[in-house]
Amino acid sequence: MSVERTLSIIKPDAVAKNVIGQIIARFENAGLKVIAARLQQLSRADAERFYAVHKERPFFKDLVDFMVSGPVFVQVLEGEGAIQKNRDLMGATDPKKAAPGTIRADFADSIDANAVHGSDAAETAAVEVAFFFPEINIHSR
């Protein structure tokens, strides 16, 4: 297994619940390192660009509305098998179907307000990381 980078977004619902630290602790306890991070308010244009792959889906407008409803915490995680490890820690998209002990089972309220986003593959991780963080702002450690 190789060292990978993946994007993680702690969404507005989890930021509002003040659980950023608890979520980051789960990543770190699983061996992932935070190598870039910031709290930011997404503009509608940025949210639409980031989720452009879903533009034709019926949930697109609601997703964008939700993602601009409050600040998000974006971070780059690095570690062995980081992409899959992050996805395992997050749990199923629908928190009702997420395994106990996963981030979404513990902190999410609904399929829309589901606490976190994580890249789903190496190709998307590279694009998503670059969307938020120029290479100069990423610091492997």
UniProtKB/Swiss-Prot annotation:
GO biological process terms, semicolon-separated: CTP biosynthetic process; GTP biosynthetic process; UTP biosynthetic process
Predominant subcellular localization, coarse grouping: cytoplasm
PROSITE patterns in UniProt: NDPK_LIKE
UniProt family annotation: Belongs to the NDK family.
Organism, as annotated: Bordetella petrii (strain ATCC BAA-461 / DSM 12804 / CCUG 43448)
Protein name: Nucleoside diphosphate kinase
GO molecular function, one term: ATP binding
GO cellular component terms listed in the entry, alphabetical order: cytoplasm
Essential cofactor(s): Mg(2+)
Enzyme class: transferase
UniProt cross-references to CDD domains, sorted A to Z: NDPk_I
Active site: residue positions: 117 (pros-phosphohistidine intermediate)
Subcellular location: Cytoplasm
Subunit relationships: Homotetramer.
Binding-site list for ATP: 11, 59, 87, 93, 104, 114
Enzyme Commission designation: 2.7.4.6
InterPro entries on file: NDK-like_dom, NDK-like_dom_sf, Nucleoside_diP_kinase
Role: Major role in the synthesis of nucleoside triphosphates other than ATP. The ATP gamma phosphate is transferred to the NDP beta phosphate via a ping-pong mechanism, using a phosphorylated active-site intermediate.
Catalysed reactions, semicolon-separated: a 2'-deoxyribonucleoside 5'-diphosphate + ATP = a 2'-deoxyribonucleoside 5'-triphosphate + ADP; a ribonucleoside 5'-diphosphate + ATP = a ribonucleoside 5'-triphosphate + ADP
Keywords: ATP-binding, Cytoplasm, Kinase, Magnesium, Metal-binding, Nucleotide metabolism, Nucleotide-binding, Phosphoprotein, Transferase
SMART domains for the chain: NDK
